[in-house]
Amino acid sequence: MAVQKNKPTRSKRGMRRSHDSLTAPHLSIDKFSGETHIRHHITNNGYYKGKKVI
């Protein structure tokens, strides 16, 4: 089992945690219906890039 020789510094801890933060979802407004949706996802009405897919 791997056991560390020295205690990791606060700097190393911070560097490891630098990618842990949460980001807000990137939202877009559909040009045709005016509905807000997550980018690269279909709208609630089933439209994607102005075409009905569902």
Curated annotation (Swiss-Prot):
Location of region: Disordered: 1-26
Cite the entry's keywords alphabetically. Answer: Ribonucleoprotein, Ribosomal protein
Comp. bias (Basic residues): 7-16
- GO term, biological process aspect, one: translation
Q: Name one GO molecular function term.
A: structural constituent of ribosome
Any one cellular-component term (Gene Ontology):
large ribosomal subunit
Mind telling me which InterPro entries this protein's record contains? Ribosomal_bL32, Ribosomal_bL32_bact, Ribosomal_zn-bd
Which family does the record claim for this protein?
Belongs to the bacterial ribosomal protein bL32 family.
- Name of this chain's protein: Large ribosomal subunit protein bL32
Q: Which organism is it from?
A: Buchnera aphidicola subsp. Acyrthosiphon pisum (strain APS)
Q: What is the lineage of its organism?
A: Bacteria, Pseudomonadati, Pseudomonadota, Gammaproteobacteria, Enterobacterales
